[in-house]
Amino acid sequence: MDTTTAAGKLFALLDAFGPEQPDFSLAELSMRSGLPKSTSHRILAVLQTWRGVERSVSGRYRQGIKFFELGGLVQDRLRIREVALPYMEDLLATTREMVHLAKLDGTDVLYIERLVSHRSVRSPSRVAGRVPAACTGVGKAILAFSSPDVVKSVIAAGLPALTPYSITNPVQFLETLERIRVLGVSYDSEEASLGLNCVAAPIFNHTGAPVAAMSVSGPVGRLSPEALVPAIRAATLAVGRHLGYQPKAMTVPAAAASS
């Protein structure tokens, strides 16, 4: 590992924490990472403020709660993909159109999985890629059932115009989210990419929170989003049930419902 850069030094120190013992002294971490004690101490101090490491009264260090939180996020993401993949494959076989699975990450959607067929057309989406949530079917499906603060943060960041059909007016955007809450599905009519439309539905977890969304996308003129509503809703409901979701547990945030 290149330890001449700040990032290299950080990762070298993080790699020094091993599973063979619960905590390490500064001298042990310095030796294991190959970094001087002064450098190790400085990085550890920064990690402490970030909750990346904890220092005991005896001066020994162990990994902090922040890494457990981040690990949980990755585990949740992998879990959702694992559960959703068979249903995505069924949708692909049935529709022969592109199928997406995505999560909300800040004001963007982060694509976890994408399945394509031989007749799928080009799309701006890719696995691990990001697109502004407000312009996508999956993003709007999640936002419609998210807390008012989450929706406000997306609007405050600005509603981008990826195409002439993107919704950039906050009032119109809130009205769109209200319709999605009523219908249970979201549509993207060339809002993210010209020539493409889609239908999407949210995936809820055991608390009734929208943790992801799934969509079927295809070219305008070939894909009929309305005809795919039963299929996409059945797929997302099935995934949600695997995550512990019970339909009666779903609640729409009061402030969002009155937007």
Q: What would you call each of these model-derived segments?
A:
Residues 1-77, 81, 240-245:
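N-terminal helix-turn-helix
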Residues 245-259:
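Short, highly charged C-terminal tails/helix-capping segments
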Residues 53-54, 101-102, 203:
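A structural signal for short hydrophobic beta-strand segments in well-ordered beta-sheet cores
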Residues 33, 44, 67, 88, ...:
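Short amphipathic alpha-helical/adjacent loop interface patches that line ligand
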Residues 59-157:
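Amphipathic alpha-helical effector-binding/dimerization core
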Residues 18, 139, 143, 147, ...:
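Short amphipathic alpha-helical signal-transduction/dimerization elements
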Residues 165-238, 242, 258:
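Extended hydrophobic
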Residues 3-7, 26, 64, 77, ...:
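Short, structured helix-loop boundary elements
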